[in-house]
Amino acid sequence: MGLQRWFYRGGRPNLMARLLDRGTAALSARGGGPEYLVALEVPGRRSGRIISLPLVVATVGGERYLVSMLGEGVNWVRNVRAAGGEVALRHGRREEVHLQEVVAPDLRAPVLKAYLKRATNASAHVPIDKDAPLAEFERLAPRFPVFRMVPRNSA
């Protein structure tokens, strides 16, 4: 089993992954790392406290997207849905956005493909080659939530 899969065995981060995620989220929130690495800030659906975690932004056609490499059951996806998509992203500065879920698999597919090219660690969780034809991504797309970022003032 690869290290990336070990970190998220069972679809949930283990202690080491949580510590690394916390550090990476803090770094990206302060503007460290590449521009496409952001800290997502979303209220916990049970606790209400702000949860921060690092995510990779995929860009397609000038639009920005977030993808769940672990699929539907992860907490950040549940928290985003519970918050009605109202979240903040940080990379040096705080940006309030509305995350609009992309439902149609044919619209998710190009985003998923762009995401895999940028987030190389995601390939351990998304069972497809980043250079596969778009039709293969369409078959896989329903398993991976995709959210389009809309600036809050234009949502």
Language-model features and meaning:
Residues 1-30:
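Extreme N-terminal tail/first-helix region
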Residues 9-13, 47-50, 83-84:
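Short hydrophobic/aromatic-rich motifs at helix boundaries and adjacent loops
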Residues 24-25, 52-53, 133-135:
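A generic local structural motif
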Residues 33-37, 143-144:
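A short helix-loop-beta-strand connector motif used in the catalytic cores of GNAT acetyltransferases and
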Residues 35-69:
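Short beta-strand segments
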Residues 71-152:
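Short, structured beta-strand-loop surface elements
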